[in-house]
Amino acid sequence: MRAMNLTLLTDLYELTMMQGYFKNPTDQVVVFDMFYRRNPCDGGYAVMAGLEQVIEYIRDLHFAPDDIEYLKSLNMFDRDFLEYLRGFHFTGDVYAIPEGTVVFPREPLLKVVAPVMEAQLLETAILNIINHQSLIATKAARVVYAAQGDGVMEFGLRRAQAPDAGIYGARAAVIAGCIGTSNVLTGQMFDVPVKGTHAHSWIMSFPDEYTAFKTYANLYPDSCILLVDTYDVLKSGVPNAIRVFKEMKEKNPDFKGYGIRIDSGDLAYLSKKAYRMLDEAGFGDAVISASSDLDEYLIDSLKAQGAKINSWGVGTNLITAKDCPAFGGVYKLAAIKNSEDREFEPKIKLSENTEKVTNPGNKTIYRIYDKENGKIRADLICLADETFDESKDMIIFDPLETWKKTKIEGGSYVLRELLVPVFQKGECVYSSPSVMEIQKICRQEQETLWDETRRLVNPHEVYVDLSDKLYKIKSDLLEEMGTAALKYQ
């Protein structure tokens, strides 16, 4: 979970392919792209997350003696290959989109440029890390958006699929805008706020609800959120909470940070009734927090119903991304060159499914912003050595429906290159921001999205297009591959 050597966190076929390359020596340097094809949760975007853990993985990549012994026990790997693994370390380059950035289908979130054996080994761990955290960050961003500025707390540890999913899922949730997590270990590891109240068992362990509330308020006067649905929200919970608030206020006029949490029942109805009772008692500024199997759709519905809730604790549906439990990231070969070659040879993977045909070449991505309002107009995938003049018109092509072309007038847009260097010649050259710094980045990133892209249902799709040069290379390869295929029919 922590301080582990994750080198064997890989699929077996990565190692069998490595041995194949080892036994058939090659000096090939390759380019692999990590990207995804569809936005999770039927949304309009995703949030990049997990880069810090990828950096840690690559930086510590080595085969320990017990790793070598285990691989030897499989009776699949020759002695000379195992000896090679003893001295293995990463020597290549990695480029990535920074964490917290909003991203879209088909564009490389991460690019590896390295000797073929090294690049191949990285595949599984990179996908495991980025797929998980980007999924949870995306789900959390949707939940935070639905809350319309109210605080959202991540409460899902007990429902997460194992400790690591809880730890790093909470990290991703905070990146996406959650104000804190109930997960204390995540708080310690990443210096993020930890939040929580008390359970029904606290109430039940006392002779009566009032005594339980009073005891808790005396213990935590600056963070006194009382769970009011153990017995009856309106007949018992809220009246007892008001009684305690009055007593605390009499003792300390500066008493604040108080409120209630409702964990069951009709949240819209109960919150309205509870607010009226609190307001009439002089506590209209109380926090009214809700939990109970929330997700972005229920929060959006409660908002539409006028629920008097201003704080949300979201657990199962967030930490598991229950309605969209997988992020479909893939890792595909895009280009190859031998040591004597000056330029990469583009490679393309064909498929019966158009969306699975890859984009060839050593590429980068430019984000195209509207110069007036700062909103994203499109993303442009191009070759890594291409440059553009913002004063000139730009023609871009849809990678799937290539007859669709868009002209963006010169002077009306601003470009930003998304992929940044992370490793150069095996050395990390990137300084990871803190989680709370990434959260600020993510908040700013989401402001660059049009409202139509952020909406929860049937969002507008942001265009991810190809440059003229890349479009021509892809078209030529498709024609060449198609002609070659005809020879075998």
List the predicted regions and their residue ranges.
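Gly/Ser/Thr/Ala-enriched C-terminal appendages of enzymes
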Residues: 1-28, 32, 41-43, 281, ...
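Buried, small/hydrophobic-residue-enriched core segments of structured protein domains
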Residues: 1-29, 38-40, 76-77, 82-91, ...
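N-terminal, Lys/Arg-enriched amphipathic/low-complexity engagement segments
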Residues: 26, 30-86
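An N-terminal, globular interaction/scaffold subdomain
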Residues: 56-61, 96-99, 103
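Short amphipathic C-terminal alpha-helix that caps PH/PH-like domains
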Residues: 58, 122, 126-130, 442, ...
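Short coil/turn segments at secondary-structure boundaries
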Residues: 69-70, 138-142, 156, 454-461
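Short acidic, Pro/Gly- and aromatic-enriched capping/linker segments at domain boundaries
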Residues: 94-100, 413-418
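Hydrophobic residues within beta-strands of alpha/beta enzymes
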Residues: 195, 260, 288, 310-312
